[in-house]
From Swiss-Prot:
GO CC, alphabetical: extracellular region
The keyword Ubl conjugation belongs to this UniProt entry's keyword annotation: no
Enzyme Commission number(s): 3.2.1.99
Species this chain originates from: Emericella nidulans (strain FGSC A4 / ATCC 38163 / CBS 112.46 / NRRL 194 / M139) (Aspergillus nidulans)
PANTHER family, per database record: ARABINAN ENDO-1,5-ALPHA-L-ARABINOSIDASE, ARABINAN ENDO-1,5-ALPHA-L-ARABINOSIDASE B
This protein's name: Arabinan endo-1,5-alpha-L-arabinosidase B
CDD domains the record matches: GH43_AnAbnA-like (cd18831)
Pfam families: Glyco_hydro_43 (PF04616)
Residues that carry a glycan: N24, N184, N372
Length: 400
């Protein structure tokens, strides 16, 4: 076994030696690493029960034993870093996407400085590297509510311990600026920052309600451009106009619903469930791709919720501009409910979503969290999976 592990380690190191840089923070090389990685007592090895072969046209997943939700992964030299939901944003390291993964600490030194939502365990981190510094964008909120905020922390190193929490960038529901369009009708969570070839940075965000939006950032990457002076240039990226399920408010006996200044409900959407979230922008010449998760992410203890076809799946649209419009194969705008499904439930892979794109010398990798239905449908058992991507006529196709 020791010989096998050594061989695996050497092969992994060789394969990761040539990584092309990406402004999106998806793959990096030649960056100093102040936190050397060694497997230890917190190491999580490859999945003991790998997902079974697909039976729905989708390939099986490369499954791992890393329990995670909404992962953000970058590669620095020969080491992969994963940032995910957990106390103060949990960081794991590995020499291979397959693992073994080791928890090495937290990104923040304590609670987020933003006084909203779940400050102890910020959601949906998105980490990028640019201009010699790492930036981790995160969100704080409460489930089912859009009284949310997006913050950012930065560091000269990707590991734990040396991050500065810059705090609030943008917020919805309540607080300064939340009455500005489109913040008065959107949900400021699931941040994703994309830096275009000309150096312009865009913050993509949104979950449920009116869907996914984009706003430009200032050059220092910690301030939204135009928010303070009334010149905010927001673009609507994607939406689910249909009512996929009834709102819980429809059966509520509550006399009042908490609302923002504009009258838009803060907790619960009386128009129904519009399950679109987790936007992630990537570039593969000559197109920009807007990836997102559609459907229900969690709460599958009820068997009926597992069989109605409304669980998470990964969709995409493309454009010739980072500002859109993004369309699917049929030419339907994502704002009008379009979206090409690239990966969904198959075999023991259930409800894949919370995705991102990682680029290495062999091409693009679609990574995500999913539930292994042969193990558990519990939220806490979501784990990291991934697939390679091929492009056919400019459209991404998941392969094993």
């Amino acid at each position: 076994m020791a010989v096998i592990f050594v061989l695996f380690f050497l092969v992994s190191m060789a394969l990761s030696a040539r990584i092309r840089p990406s402004f999106n923070g998806t793959a990096l090389s030649g960056t100093s690493n102040k936190h050397p990685f060694e497997p230890g007592p917190n190491t999580i090895f490859r999945e003991e029960v790998p997902p079974s072969a697909a039976a729905s046209g989708f390939p099986s997943a490369h499954g791992t034993e890393l329990r995670t939700h909404d992962p953000s992964i970058i590669k620095v030299g020969s080491i992969y870093y994963s940032y995910s939901v957990g106390p103060s944003i949990t960081i794991h390291q590995a020499f291979s996407l397959d693992g073994p993964w080791t928890e090495v600490g937290a990104l923040l030194s304590g609670e987020s400085v933003i006084k909203k939502g779940d400050r102890k365990a910020p959601w949906a981190a998105n980490t990028i590297y640019i201009n010699g510094r790492y930036y981790c964008y995160y969100s704080v909120s409460n489930s089912g509510c859009r009284d949310s905020a997006i913050g950012v922390a930065s560091s000269a190193f990707p590991g734990p311990g040396e991050w500065t929490d810059h705090g609030l960038i943008i917020q919805s529901g309540t607080g300064e600026g939340s009455d500005v369009f489109p913040l008065n009708q959107s949900n400021t969570i699931d941040p994703n920052v994309f830096v275009d070839g000309d150096g312009t940075a865009y913050l993509n965000f949104g979950s449920f309600w009116t869907g996914l939006w984009q706003v430009p950032l200032e050059e220092e990457l910690v301030t939204v451009k135009g928010l303070q002076d009334g010149t905010l240039d927001a673009v609507h990226l994607a939406a689910e106009p249909g009512k996929v399920w009834r709102s819980k408010l429809a059966n509520s006996k509550a006399k009042t619903v908490s609302t923002s200044k504009t009258g838009s409900p803060i907790c619960g959407d009386p128009t129904g469930g519009h399950p679109i979230e987790g936007g992630f922008m990537a570039y593969h010449a000559p197109y920009y791709y807007m990836w997102f998760s559609w459907g229900r992410c969690c709460e599958f203890k009820d068997p009926a919720m597992r069989s109605n076809g409304k669980e998470y799946r990964i969709r995409v649209g493309r454009s010739t501009s980072a500002r859109g419009p993004f369309v699917d194969k049929q030419g339907i705008d994502l704002v009008d409910g379009g979206g090409e499904t690239v990966y969904g439930s198959n075999g023991d892979v259930f409800a894949p979503g919370g995705q991102g794109i990682l680029t290495d010398e062999f091409g693009d990798i679609l990574y995500y969290h999913y539930l292994n239905s042969s193990v558990s449908y519990d939220f806490a058992d979501a784990r990291l999976g991934y697939n390679r991507l091929e492009y056919v006529d400019g459209w991404p196709v998941a392969v094993y």
